[in-house]
Amino acid sequence: MTGAMAQTKLNIVLCGFMGCGKSTVGKKLSQMTQMEFVDMDGYIEKRAGMKSPDIFEKHGEGFFRDLEHEAAVELSQRGGYVVATGGGALTFQRNVDAFKEGGVIVLLDTPLRVLQLRLKNDRNRPLLQRPDRFRFIRELHQKRMPLYRRAADVVIPTKGSPNAVCRQVLQALEEKNLTNS
């Protein structure tokens, strides 16, 4: 399976709410499949030459979302990546469409209470720097999860270790014949 994945041009696109483990699982999945890992926000930041919060502040959300879409199209055309999307990327249908053209979308489904515990002391996410962070997380989670579920080809509950989640992802892709192998 892992050798076959390395030869494929299909992307494995990980989506889910912030704190669900997209980057952690993505890096491990990259090692297991010998596919290159791409953190979408990092990819956008590198291309723009500035951090995401600075892009939002200087150019606005619309500009960031355009860069995000360009990245989705580019990655889908090139293929062969494990992609960790930003939390908002797949709330836009044009990004869902782009990623589905070149890959398989995998939702890492993590219970809200687990996300709240993981994000409780997170100081690296500008969206969470607010006094009502738990209410905000709950409301955003309720808004985004139906969009993630609609976009996903595969839904993986994030119970167990990151390695166990990776094995579940690979098994699900194989069972659904979504590996091009």
Model-found features: residue ranges?
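ATP-binding Walker
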Residues: C20
